[in-house]
Curated annotation (Swiss-Prot):
Function according to Swiss-Prot or TrEMBL: Peptide chain release factor 1 directs the termination of translation in response to the peptide chain termination codons UAG and UAA.
Modification note: Methylated by PrmC. Methylation increases the termination efficiency of RF1.
CC per GO annotation: cytoplasm
Protein name: Peptide chain release factor 1
Amino acid sequence: MFERLEQIETRYEELGREMADPALIADQQKYQKTAKQHRELEDVVEKFREYREVQNGIADARGMMNEADAEIRAMAEEELASLEERLPQIEADLKLLLLPKDPNDEKNVVVEIRAGTGGDEASLFAAEVFRMYARYAEQRRWKVEVLSMSESSVGGAKEVIAIIEGDHVYSQMKYESGVHRVQRVPATETQGRVHTSAITVAVLPEAEEVDVKIEAKDLRIDTFCSSGPGGQSVNTTYSAVRITHLPTNTVVSCQDEKSQIKNREKAMRVLRSRLYEVEMERQQQALAKERKQQVGSGDRSEKIRTYNFPQNRLTDHRIGLTIHQLAEVMEGRLQPVIDALTAHFNAERLKAESEAVA
């Protein structure tokens, strides 16, 4: 591990020198590429330098233990205990930083939320979960753009498809895919009974054109009049677009914009991301089979979370996390949940990596 860390540090320093070269600065495209590589190595190098500093401090403290002065020996003993306590965490951080990066972590995401079992109550909850993600995105200074929304008659959402753009969005949102279950007393319930409803969430990394090759001959594009809640026509022009990818029978519709061109662009963004996810799943399954481990962080059929409103309780079933701050989470304060999930799945990756090496 340490030989690899030294190689990374050497490369980091080389990139730093290259960035100071006026010839590179003049070529902004190359400069940006070099700066990106430099940034990607920065966290590892800083942690490695911290590790080395602590190791040197431990060596110095041990040397001072031989001093004749009792006060100096006591200080050295205290310093040694403090540094040795820090070392295991730094080593764990280094191992984590050396894990292969998820190439999608920096990407924007397409979020698809659909009401499942529970009728009107499920549609209301789907709208609330979308609002929760929108509030969370606002706190992270991300941009949310609704691509498509199908409203229910009670003001909920049968389906919401949106793009969230910003810094490392997929890295924070990727563990949200799955079935989200809600337990509460609906406003229409006269007996005060708790009902259970469910929605599905899919989080897809937004694919660029270079990520997925789509042939024009593989697409069927239909246009139709936009419709609102209950099916009434809201637009007399054929601005709504439905795109079918014939080889996979993947269908995407978009009718939010008045312009057919804009609706087509939005639909293509979703289609690219769905096809990219299909290819990602195929690769993950092949890797899981090879390593004989289960891939479970993105299965949309997996019940991942329960929101119990009477008890103000959120439970994430994948990691056994329970918090009694549901009201705050629904306001977008989702970071503690995301941090716990990230820590859990990173630990799983570390374990899998260790077993693969063994």
